[in-house]
A protein has these predicted regions:
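Periplasmic-binding protein-like
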Residues: 68-70
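Cofactor-binding loops of NAD(P)H-dependent oxidoreductases
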Residues: 48-50
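A hydrophobic C-terminal alpha-helical subdomain
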Residues: 209-267
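Oxidoreductase cofactor-interface core, primarily capturing Rossmann-like NAD(P)-dependent enzymes
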Residues: 2-42, 52-58, 62-65, 74-90, ...
């Protein structure tokens, strides 16, 4: 079975390729803009191309049985059309919570007629890197909405679900909401980061206007969207869990384990 991974050197795409290799997939194709610098596992066939330029996907799609579709809204309809024309038998797409900004990906995949699996993760644990500069400067996190609650997921766990869906026969037609294994407040996340880093951390609650100024320097115009999300999670805490373990059978990554593995991002 031939598997094509688009966005293969992106954060999650690279993890999908690695997980497919670990699971013993023998015919993996990786689409990336710079094959010479891809540094992917031995045995992976690397194609030059980008899902943002659909014509470059054409050589890689021929003979493909299943495809991992990394998110790219501007060209998703054309990429799906090309996959259908090439006879791809199953698309596993990375979108987001149903009805959110990534919904057009699921709509395009379903419209093209190829059997599908939707991956719908919420927030990634890696979003904690928004605090990296603050942690390098000291032990205080300045942010708003300390009581916002959700269950962020490790990107590695999303990749494991993607690889499972790509290799499991007869499983299309599922939409998988994905979270981490525990619901945590922002304040609790900071406490766990401190445990991983070996020093106590403090969450200093800022008024929204001050937090907007802080995070506009980090995120630009996305800072408003970030704070809107925290406000929503304060009013409506996300406590329903959909851990990857329910699909893969492997333990889902806890926030503390993720923080210990990625402590270098904050030092």
């Amino acid at each position: 079975m031939t598997v094509l991974v688009t966005g293969a050197t992106g954060n999650i795409g690279r993890m999908v390729v690695t997980e497919l290799h670990r699971l013993g997939a023998h015919d993996v194709r990786a689409l990336t803009v710079d094959p010479g610098r891809a540094a992917l596992p031995a045995g992976v066939t690397v194609f030059r191309g980008h899902r943002g330029r659909p014509a470059t996907v054409v050589p890689a799609r021929e003979g493909v049985h299943v495809m991992y579709l990394a998110p790219h809204l501007p060209t998703v309809t054309e990429i799906c059309r090309l996959a259908a024309a090439a006879g791809v038998g199953h698309i596993v797409d990375l979108a987001g919570p149903r009805g959110g900004i990534w919904q057009p990906i699921e709509d395009a995949v379903e419209a093209c007629g190829v059997p599908w699996t939707h991956l719908e993760p919420g927030e990634f644990m890696a979003n904690a890197t928004l605090w990296s500069a603050q942690l390098r400067a000291g032990d205080v996190i300045r942010d708003a909405y300390p009581d916002a609650v959700n269950a962020p997921i490790a990107q590695e766990d999303v990749a494991r679900v993607a690889a499972h869906a790509l290799l499991a026969p007869g499983r299309p037609g599922n939409a998988y909401p994905l979270t981490g294994p525990e619901a945590l407040s922002r304040r609790q996340m900071v406490t766990l980061l401190g445990e991983a880093l070996g020093r106590p951390l403090h969450y200093l609650e800022l008024p929204r206007a001050q937090a907007l100024a802080v995070f506009t320097e980090v995120q630009g115009v996305a800072a408003n969207w970030y704070l809107d999300g925290l406000a929503a999670l304060t009013a409506h805490p996300q406590t329903t869990l959909h851990p990857s373990s329910h699909i893969t059978g492997q333990p889902a990554t806890t926030y503390l384990d993720w923080a210990r593995t990625h402590a270098h991002l904050f030092q």
